[in-house]
A protein has these predicted regions:
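N-terminal leader/targeting and accessory segments in enzymes
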Residues: 1-90, 94, 238, 260-268, ...
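Phosphate-binding loop of NTP-binding sites
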Residues: 88-235, 239-247, 302, 311, ...
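A short acidic, helix-capping loop that chelates divalent metal ions and anchors anionic groups
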Residues: 74, 141-146, 203-209, 379, ...
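ATP-dependent carboxylate-amine ligase
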Residues: 1-13, 36-39, 283, 306-316, ...
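Short, well-ordered alpha-helix to beta-strand connector turns
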Residues: 24, 36-37, 62, 75-76, ...
């Protein structure tokens, strides 16, 4: 595709230099990659400025640049834009012939519940006869085909490449997790969502957004900027009233405590699942028997149901889709251990999520509730003592250990968590090495105990000092049990 054709729809275009007829055959955001006839995107980030790597990108095959300032030391065509990230999204869409215009999109945003809700939306829409795709934290899916991804919402190059593959595979509906980072970084600029879903807002990502207000405003923009055509909104969330006041698009509310268009009644929670009546304001209702437990999964089911109903899916297909889903990777996932105690894997890595999983497990714990968790490095430090306090209040024993320390000192992170747990009477131990911590949990587990491994969930790595090393807790648990049994 000619460069001029590629950039003609970019609203951020200011000026061009050089031969705009040059053919572009690839997209590049990593100057170290060999990219023949590629276009390299330059913009200033939080930690580096890609403009300084433009010569390396050209040396590796790029024949054009998108820049936020002209570079005099690089002799290739340059496209000057006012916002490099936003321009990147639009150019990626054009390069792949606009896959975002060829499918229906459901975007789920919120601090918690995005992954499970997206899986539920996919399941419901498949029951309705649609071929579905999924984009999210656990990776992307085309039907049952899994495509690994390192971000909740991928960068535009990867996102549009995967969406184009979905189009080629005949996908009709895509359930997508929409992170606040993706919104703020313009990764989704140019996309339109038939339905946007707001799940909730609680403390997370303050290392990036600074304040909860900034975090909320970023989420709200998804519903007020024209990106979403319809909205499904959790009426029970404390920021719902403010969101509803400013949202002008058609919307459906859902909830349990608050008055809502879609709500759950007669909720019964067991260790094996949840049953409830899903009711509409017109008095129509359907009985739902989820095979996933926890009150938070009632909310996830409500959010998915609201999205599906907005898409025009029948209540019966909503029921069938919700009841057919057994589990979501790393979300209150019961591991097969063949032990007198149970081991549960969960992605909980923020205060509310930790509270939810521990409260849920407490309802069906016969003996002790043992919580193993840490906090990620280079992320919101304010939540560390809060999570320590939550663990100390809700678990019988906390095992504090490393999550993904990244570039921070693991013991310093643990000391900050410890500050919170010391405010409680909860029993705890500190074992920095996560594998050793899991071994300790398995060694002390007794009949009737529940051990909850929090924080990693579906992840198959641990990041320490900037290096990601293989660490799949499902595998680690099985390896340790084999060792402990002397097999």
């Amino acid at each position: 595709m000619e460069l001029r054709q590629l950039v003609k729809e970019v609203p951020y275009l200011m000026e061009t230099r050089g031969n705009m007829s040059v053919e572009i055959a690839a997209l590049c955001s990593n100057s170290r990659e060999k990219t023949e006839n590629g276009i390299f995107f330059c913009f200033a980030g939080a930690h580096f400025d890609a403009h300084q790597y433009a010569p390396q990108a050209v040396q590796n095959g790029c024949v054009a640049l998108v820049v936020e300032r002209f570079l005099d030391d690089v002799n290739v065509p340059q496209v000057l834009v006012s916002n490099g990230r936003a321009a990147m999204a639009r150019i990626c869409e054009a390069f792949f012939d606009h896959p975002e215009r060829k499918m229906r999109f459901v975007g789920i945003t919120g601090t918690k519940g995005k992954t499970t809700t997206s899986y539920m939306v996919k399941s419901i829409c498949e029951q309705a006869g649609f071929k579905c795709g999924l984009v999210g934290t656990t990776g992307n899916m085309i039907g049952e085909k899994h495509i690994p991804s390192s971000k909740t919402t991928p960068d535009p190059i990867d996102l549009m490449r995967d969406l184009n593959e979905m189009v080629q595979a005949g996908v009709q509906v895509v359930a997508m997790e929409v992170s606040a980072h993706a919104l703020d970084m313009h990764r989704l600029d140019g996309m339109t969502f038939e339905c946007g879903c707001y799940t909730n807002l609680s403390q997370d990502h303050l290392d990036y957004f600074g304040t909860m207000e900034n975090y909320f405003q970023c989420k709200k923009a998804f519903f007020t900027s024209g990106m979403a055509k319809n909205a499904a909104i959790n009426a029970d969330d404390e920021r719902a009233a403010e969101l509803l006041r400013d949202v002008t698009i058609p919307h459906m509310t859902y909830g349990i405590a608050a008055e809502a268009d879609l709500f759950a009644r007669d909720i019964e929670i067991t260790e094996n699942g949840v049953s409830f009546e899903l009711r509409l304001r017109n008095a129509e209702y359907i009985q739902i028997n989820l095979r996933m437990t926890g009150m938070f999964n009632v909310y996830n089911a409500l959010s998915a149901a609201a999205c599906a109903l907005i898409l025009g899916v029948s209540p019966e297909n909503v029921r069938a889709g919700l009841e057919s889903i057994r589990s979501v990777p790393g979300r209150i996932e019961m591991l097969p251990t063949n032990t007198p105690y149970r081991v549960i894997l969960d992605y909980a890595h923020a205060p509310d999520a930790l509270s939810n999983i521990l409260r849920t497990c407490r309802t069906f714990t016969k003996k002790r509730l043992i919580a193993l968790f840490g906090c990620g490095g280079d992320r919101d430090k304010g939540k560390r003592p809060i999570m320590g306090r939550i663990g100390g209040e809700l678990a019988d024993l906390c095992i504090l250990t490393s999550d993904n320390p990244r570039t921070e000192d693991p013991m310093e992170i643990l000391r900050e968590i410890e500050e919170g747990i010391k405010e409680t009477t909860g029993e705890y131990v500190v074992i920095e090495n996560r594998r050793d911590a899991i071994r300790h949990a398995l060694e002390i587990g007794r009949e009737g105990d529940i051990i909850v491994l929090c924080g990693k969930g579906h992840e198959t790595y641990q990041e320490t000092m900037g290096v990601k090393r293989p660490f799949d807790e499902k595998v680690v648990v099985q390896e340790l049990l084999t060792e402990l049994r002397g097999e």
